[in-house]
C-alpha cells in the first residue's frame, strides 16, 4: 500500500496556526502602541468628512511596530469608510518613480505595461483610475529612505501632493523609515508641501517583548507544544537587537518549523538557538549595501570592542584609514549608524575627558562580522 510523503504533515504537529507569526499578519489589538494609533487615526480622520488628511512621517528602529501600526489603522479606516483605499508600497522593492507609479496603478486594478510608458503617462493613468474608482487613497511608502535616495523621488512626491490641488482628490501620504533625517533628503519645495507630522516609535522593552511574544505564541502553537523558557529567550535575543520584535517573531516561526522537521513533540530552546543562527538581523541586511567604506571600517573596529568612547574610536579609525575625515564628519557617521540601529550611543562622563559618548554595538557582533566578510 502506497503512503504519501505528506501523510505525516496531516498529523498534529507543533503549530496550531503559524500564520500568526507571518510578517504580514495584523493583530486584532496592538499593545503598547495606543498613543501612536491615536495620532495616526486622528491625522487621517478628516477623510471621514471629505477633508484632506494630515501627511505623516513615522520613524523608529526596526521591529518597533511602525509598519504593522500603520496597516492596522488603515484596515480599521477602510472597514469604517468604504471610500478610503490604503495602498501599501515597500520602497525596498519599489524604489523609483516609475516602479511606485506602476504599483499604485496596479493597486487600483489598472495594470500598465512594464515598459513603453513614460512616468507622466503612468501618473495620468493613476489619476484616471482614482477618478473612476472614486476613492480617497492613503499611500504608505515604507522604507521611504530607499525611495528618497533616488533622484526622481522628489518629483514623485510632488506629483502625489498636487493631486488634491489639481483634481480635487484627497490623497494622504505616510512615509515610514528607520532614519530620523529621512525628510532632510527631500527637495525643500517638496518637504514644505508635504508638511508631514512626525510620529516616533521607540524600542520595545524586554517585558513588552515578552507580552507580545506570549500573545503570538498562544495563537500560533498548541498549548503544550512550546517549552516555557522559549519565550523568555526569544525576548532576550530581540532585546539584544535593539528591541526588534520582528526578529523574535521570525525566530519563533523558524524554530517551530525546525522542531516539526525534526519530529519533535515540543519547541525547545535548542530549536530556538538554531533559528537564531539562520536569521540575520534585518537592520543589518537592509543597511549594509548602503554603507560607505568609512562606516564599514567603523563597524569592523567596533567588533573588536564591547564598548568604546567616541574619542578613542576616532583615533582607532584615523590610525587605520588613509581616507581622513574631520571629527564632525566622523560624528555624523556614528549618528547615521545609530539611526540605522546598528550602533548604540549614550552620553557618558569619563574621568579626565569630561562629557563624551560611549559607543556600543546594537546588533550581534557575529552577524556584523558575517555580513562584512568580503568587504
Ranges and model annotations:
Residues 55-57, 79-93, 197:
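Conserved catalytic segments around the Walker B and adjacent sensor/switch elements
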Residues 305-375:
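Terminal-proximal interaction/regulatory segments of ATP-powered molecular machines
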Residues 1-53:
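A short, basic N-terminal segment
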Residues 75-85, 109-112:
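Post-Walker A helix-loop "phosphate-sensing" segment adjacent to the P-loop in P-loop NTPases
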Residues 50-73, 93:
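Walker A/P-loop nucleotide-binding motif
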Residues 258-283:
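Conserved C-terminal helix/linker of AAA+ ATPases
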Residues 2, 9-17, 22, 70, ...:
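Mid-core helix/loop region of P-loop NTP-binding domains shared across ATPases and GTPases
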Residues 276-299:
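Short alpha-helical segments that sit at the start of domains
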